[in-house]
């Protein structure tokens, strides 16, 4: 698996860093707190180590497929710098925020011309969307949308509805 921005925030919290605890993180921490005391510390250490060991992205099928949480530009594929890891986790932002307080993101996929297909998510959309050999499969399961997967190499999209709404989106995506 590849890490997402929320995974890395949880890892930082488990390592004792000061992070802003939002609803999703609060839920995760509350679930961890239900563990018996004799298992909690070991679990937190093991979880933090697992998350810390994840790579930012995968280059698969002899370079024909890239999987990253928020995307991956062609020139970054297969590299492991902090800049590459940040792009894989967050994409690229303008430095501005929208009317909902969320970062305004550059549409990196609109300029993508790489040879590998890139599968990513991070920014929920109503339907999976192919653009320039990239596909965003984040169809907002956490917000009551769909959980979507891409079968490769068939390029078959499979979506199943969320069982429930786990969180309310900061801005509508449907």
PLM features: residue spans?
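Active-site beta-strand termini and strand-to-loop segments that position acidic
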Residues: 60-62, 152-153
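Short catalytic/ligand-binding loop motif for oxyanion handling, primarily in non-cytosolic enzymes
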Residues: 9-12, 67-68, 74-77, 126-129, ...
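Divalent-metal (Mg2+/Mn2+/Ca2+)-assisted nucleotide/phosphate chemistry catalytic cores
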Residues: 72-73, 79-87
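Histidine-centered divalent metal-coordination motifs
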Residues: 5-6, 69, 119-124
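Short aromatic-enriched loop/helix-cap "lid" or pocket-rim segments at secondary-structure transitions
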Residues: 12-16, 77-81, 172
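Active-site-proximal beta-strand elements of phosphoester/diester hydrolases
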Residues: 65-71, 135-137
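Active-site neighborhood of divalent metal-dependent phosphoester bond hydrolases
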Residues: 1-61, 85-100
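Acidic, His/Gly-rich catalytic cores of divalent-metal-dependent hydrolytic chemistry
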Residues: 83-174
């Amino acid at each position: 698996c590849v890490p997402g921005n929320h995974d890395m925030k949880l890892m930082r919290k488990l390592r004792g860093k000061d992070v802003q605890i939002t609803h999703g993180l609060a839920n995760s921490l509350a679930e961890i707190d239900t563990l018996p005391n004799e298992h909690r510390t070991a679990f937190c250490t093991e979880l933090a180590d697992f998350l810390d060991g994840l790579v930012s992205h995968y280059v698969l099928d002899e370079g024909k497929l890239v999987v990253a949480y928020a995307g991956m530009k062609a020139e970054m594929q297969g590299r492991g710098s902090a800049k590459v890891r940040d792009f894989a986790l967050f994409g690229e932002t303008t430095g501005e925020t929208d009317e909902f307080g969320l970062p305004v993101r550059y549409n990196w996929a609109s300029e993508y011309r790489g040879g590998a297909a890139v599968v990513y998510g991070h920014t929920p959309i109503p339907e999976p969307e192919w653009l320039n050999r990239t596909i965003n499969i984040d169809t907002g399961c956490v917000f009551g949308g769909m959980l979507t997967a891409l079968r490769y190499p068939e390029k078959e999209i499979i979506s199943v509805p969320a069982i429930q709404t786990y969180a309310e989106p900061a801005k509508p995506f449907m």
